[in-house]
Amino acid sequence: MDASHPAVYPVGVPPTAVDPPPRVRMKDYEGMPSTLGGLVLRSGQFACAVTALSIMISIPDFSSVTAFCYLVAAMALQLLWSVSLAVVDGYALLLRRTLHNPVLLSLLVIGDWVTSTLSLAAACSSAGITVLIDSDLAQCAHNHCGRYEAAVAMAFLTWFLVSLSFFFSFWLLATR
């Protein structure tokens, strides 16, 4: 019985690499730090915070309610945070650099988390007072309910944009 025998042809073995090849990251998504989307998010946060702050400051007696004072303070902090990070994002875009340093990303994540929490708390407390004045006390004729509602809406929009920035930064930090 003749069985066929496999023929063995010598094949050169490729040299083994000392270091494994670098991991290939997926492309950076718009909205992450040092992208154009990130700059747009920061600019939107700034614009919404400025609008909410301007509306509240234009109301003469806003300081009589603690929740409205808290909204003004939270939007002022958000304004400073957003404009400073918009400048950093713009500078990184001009130099074509990435902001993927783990220490810097940790700072961005913690800062966005704190400012988004403050913005949400301020927006919710101000919305509660606005509903109280409008619906429960029915004193909109004596107060500026339309302005209060507009400022609260801008505060919620600010919170939404900051939350998006937080999630993009956190995602980038978690996948490093």
From Swiss-Prot:
Cytoplasmic side: 1-45, 89-102, 173-176
Keywords for this protein: Cell membrane, Membrane, Transmembrane, Transmembrane helix
One Pfam family from the record: CASP_dom
Record carries keyword S-adenosyl-L-methionine: no
One Gene Ontology CC term in the entry: plasma membrane
Annotated disulfide bonds: none
Keyword Coiled coil carried by entry: no
Location of the protein in the cell: Cell membrane
Extracellular side: 67, 124-151
Highest taxon above the source species: Eukaryota
Transmembrane segments: 46-66, 68-88, 103-123, 152-172
Membrane topology according to the record: Multi-pass membrane protein
Subunit structure: Homodimer and heterodimers.
Family recorded in the similarity comment: Belongs to the Casparian strip membrane proteins (CASP) family.
Protein name from the UniProt record: CASP-like protein 5A1
